[in-house]
């Protein structure tokens, strides 16, 4: 059945750039777009049915490169002061500490988040999941839950098992602390590589894996170098990291070296065409 969506404003592609077609029309048949233009055009096919989208924007799917893929948790985080539950208690560093969400919680969160993304017009997204559920790396179920939800609901997803070398927590006196553990970071990196293998072998054209050392300030030079080595061994697979996001991070860096933060990354080989540095404010 040939269907017309009558705008509204249609975002089209003309002369190598996007353009806005006021009262434009989109004609599709099955999963094929047959025409984008104006209804009076002689090349406009006659539709079997018409969807009235007057007053609305008709656009190709948006690409959300830095998507907080935990809308359920993130809204709670924004609505409440950080002193009310944001800081991790000291038990998170205990052996075999469990995340605040179980596997079913992650699946429900993934369904809600991917559905919300699609509802807002985001058909492709690069996921960033909340730090509230993390210690040194993701819970095992989290990226797989997002992958399953994305495939079932029809979103194109770039996903990763996140990892880092430092875990922040608050001690019993309310003082912020940070504990480093290279072995836990390596475990997280190994799981990230396993997830990339899973994505590559899934047969899905919409599922992509990448490497995500969660924050450069919580990673040693050695971990960042190993990340780049693994990226190169996988054909320069995409790498991203939170970088130079807060003034405290910048001050801690300058206390150690006179190099700028970008110069530091350049000196350890953590720059390249496959790398995306998130924020990069200082």
Language model feature labels by segment:
Residues 136-281:
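Metal-coordinating catalytic core of metallo-dependent amide/deamination hydrolases
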Residues 77-156, 188-204:
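Alpha-helical scaffold segments that flank or form the walls of functional sites
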Residues 13, 68, 130, 280-281:
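Flexible loop residues that form catalytic
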Residues 1-45, 54-57:
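N-terminal metal-binding scaffold of metallo-dependent hydrolase/deaminase domains
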């Amino acid at each position: 059945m040939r269907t017309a969506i009558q705008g509204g404003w249609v975002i089209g592609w003309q002369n190598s750039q996007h353009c806005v077609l006021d009262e434009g029309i989109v004609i599709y048949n099955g999963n094929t777009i047959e025409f984008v233009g104006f209804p009076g055009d002689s090349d406009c096919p006659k539709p079997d049915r018409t969807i009235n989208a007057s007053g609305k924007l008709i656009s190709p799917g948006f690409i959300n490169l830095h998507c907080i893929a935990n809308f359920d948790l993130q809204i709670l985080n924004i609505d409440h002061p950080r002193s009310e539950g944001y800081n991790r208690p000291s038990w998170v560093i205990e052996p075999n500490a469990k995340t605040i969400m179980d596997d079913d919680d992650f699946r429900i969160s993934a369904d809600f988040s991917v559905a919300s993304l699609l509802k807002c017009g985001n058909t492709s997204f690069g996921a960033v999941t909340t730090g509230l559920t993390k210690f040194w790396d993701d819970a095992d179920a989290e990226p797989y839950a997002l992958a399953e939800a994305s495939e079932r609901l029809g979103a194109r997803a770039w996903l990763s098992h996140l990892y880092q070398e430092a875990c922040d927590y608050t001690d019993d006196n309310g003082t912020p602390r940070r504990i480093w553990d290279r072995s836990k970071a390596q475990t997280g990196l190994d799981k990230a590589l396993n997830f990339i293998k899973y994505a590559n072998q899934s047969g899905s054209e919409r599922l992509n894996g990448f490497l995500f050392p969660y924050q450069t300030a919580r990673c040693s030079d050695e971990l960042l170098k190993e990340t780049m080595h693994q990226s190169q061994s996988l054909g320069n697979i995409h790498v991203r990291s939170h970088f130079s996001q807060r003034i405290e991070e910048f001050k801690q860096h300058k206390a150690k070296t006179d190099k700028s933060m970008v110069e530091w990354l350049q000196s350890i080989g953590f720059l390249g065409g496959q790398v995306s540095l998130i924020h990069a404010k200082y």
